Amino acid sequence: MEEEVVTKRSAITVKIGLNANNLPLEMHWSAEDGKIENAPAKAMMLSLWNPEDNNTMKIDLWTKDMSVEEMKQFFHQTLLTMADTFEKATGENLISEDLRDYCYHFAEKMDIMPEK
């Protein structure tokens, strides 16, 4: 079997504006392949798998002006997309549905259920 080789490199960048206490005041991100340049953001959760240590490295940041309501929505949507990603990556649909059920419970408890 032939070994695959890297034929292209791409970059996603995040720029964080900090205050004197190193608290994020602003965030902008760019993705060259997605044709996104300097798009504003209020929060990010970056997780990277370190294969040498079998460990997840994380960076979680949010701007000072992000409201609690926005954070609740951000977490809810992130958890839902994690269920989708897990199912796509592993084919484990039953546990992914369990996670989606939890997301429904989370939304109820946080009082962020979409109106019907």
Residue ranges and their predicted role:
Residues 84-116:
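C-terminal charged interaction modules
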